[in-house]
Amino acid sequence: MYRLISKYQADKILQMLKEELKEAEGALEGKVDWKPLPEKKESKVYAVDGSQGKARLSGTIIYTVASFAFGNGKSARLVYTNAMTYNHGISDQIIRLQMETLENKLGALVGNEEHMILMDGTLTGSLTRPPVYPESVKGITTLLDTLEKGKPEELIRDFVERLDEHYLDLEKRLAEERELYSGVILADEVIDEYSEFYKAMEGRDIVNYDGALKRLRDALKAEIPRSEIMKIAEELDEYTELKTLTLEEARNTIHVVLGYLEYLYSLEKLLQRELIYIAKSFYNRKITSKLGINLLDVPFIDAYLVKTHGKELPGYCVIYDPERAEEKKKIAHRLPRILRKYFPTVQRFIEIGVPSAYIRTMEGGIIYLLQSNTSINDELIAKLLWHESNGYIRPLQRAHEGVKIEQKAFRAELEALMNYLKKKDKELRVFIKYGRSPLE
């Protein structure tokens, strides 16, 4: 067995870390408002997590996405299995979008007003990096450019009204069954009912400005003279791409937009609940950037606590509260203007930012990033701590264990599905052979 790390490399890493520690120690005069943890307060929660499994076959992806809720009450589950023709650009993003949509739906519907909802990850991530966002915005722009005036609004309004009914149906079925395996993703079910829109788009010319905008952005970043920028702007036509929409492209555009609308609707509904997002993997510099040091927040906090208290104390530190901050930390994401009135809560958090804090629940334990849709204070922390044990938030652990799609189980079900399809029609073998990458 050959060695992966030489002594030279180990010493180099050692030196780098020592330099970072020295830099942190030099800035430790900067105060970290590390508050002691409050006493635990009894509360009810549901924790929600999601999972996905997918198999890339010859030209087809067969996939399953699921969400699972565990907490003070009966657990609940949403599962969706589907197949799509592989599109290198966005297939994986669509699958992730549907998984996150199921997580949001379950979080919005499970339990009652007494339950806090615990989500894995960050709310800023849901707001800033929704999967297929560039394709979704491009799709909405295409709708506005190719449909008659008023038609894009008609499509959006109609689908949102369908989602209203869809949620009432989901809520009723969840109360009765607790595990739903059909009728959980609306966009895929109703896409063909919007054929009048994508047929009207067929044959229309659209202009792709991606290349032109990149050239203009690069010029602006380079801070070249205004006269040069104007010259580039006059020549931008050379970097645009004109194309005529096929029926399939028009249908795919509508489909992506519907999926994005369903995701935004699920997030809007989720934001009506009392939420806590918990992330254990993050690379923030919220505190250190203010102090002008090139170090992540977590090691800096640990260095500060060891220097001032002699140990890695449990406690928490609020790093952003939009109710108190003079300057709002807007989310680096914008809803297309046509959508803002349909998702006002999503739009509000994009504009004001997300309440955030760091927390450690036991001495020497992990520092988590907390985010919420309400101010983070002793009251909220006390209710969260009711569900903490040995540094971990147990309901989230159980939700993660309950939703995980095991490789062996997915392989078995995939094999059964492929055998069923081949039995029904032997010619389908061309789509379902050469399987690879069964689980992610």
Language-model segments: residues:
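Long, contiguous domain-sized segments
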Residues: 1-43, 95-440
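Short hydrophobic beta-strand that contains or immediately precedes a catalytic carboxylate
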Residues: 45-48
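Acidic, metal-ligating active-site segments
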Residues: 50-92
